[in-house]
Amino acid sequence: METNRKPLTTAKIKSMKKEGIPITMITAYDYPSAMLAEEAGVDMILVGDSLGNVVLGYDSTLPVTVDDMIYHTKAVTRAVKSAFVVTDMPFMTYHGSLDQTLYHARRIMREGLGKAVKLEGGAEIAPAVKALTQAGVPVVGHLGLTPQSVHQIGGYRVQGKNSDQARELLKDALAIQEAGAFCLVLELVTDELAAWITDQLSIPTIGIGAGPSCDGQVLVFHDAVGYESKPWPKKFVKTYVHAGELIRDGITQFVNEVRNRQFPAGEHTFKMDQEAVDRLYGNKGN
């Protein structure tokens, strides 16, 4: 557990690439998960639109709204003192006019109190990235598997398996960097491509299912701690604890103890003194 850390900045995050210090990022969606991430010493916390899947019960990220992202970012930022908080901009909030993009980002930053926003996409969203950075909004890019485009790309598939696709992704990465992004997430891309992009960029890359060559790594909180009792196996995920099983077992024990009248026991119960009891019910001797 790390204490008394200075708040991270975009400049510090970029310098970590130059210094060869791996960057750690994890998602968080509420006060308790953000507090645990902060106490663990995570560098960056992503309030991801993955909350649609793991918190709100949707089958994709597409239904998540700006109001959802603000609500959860506010909870996260209340817990964080030093980690750098990034908020996803939801589906179709940065694909219209630049004025609309700035409006949505302004709401997320002002109301959610995060420090940056994350956008999915390549060269086609470079104008949005440029408009945001020129307005003073730090931007994290996201390439490879982009969940908001999952239907367009044909499902959750590894990207960059052939040379043509790899070259296009590098072009996209350079375009996002040129537009002003200070960091880039690479999701589900081949190890070789991630290494190539990381070498070609001056900004840090953070991988999820992108091999060990990225400048940092990110995992979804629920995957990392095994929060789901029956998690969907993913090759690129490492589960460090199985919190879901412990939580389920604890709740099961609670249910059993209540039904068997074992809880609450004496140590969980508050008592009146005898004089107060006598006054409440009446003293039979009077």
Question: What is each model feature region?
Answer:
Residues 2-274, 278-286:
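Alpha/beta enzyme core
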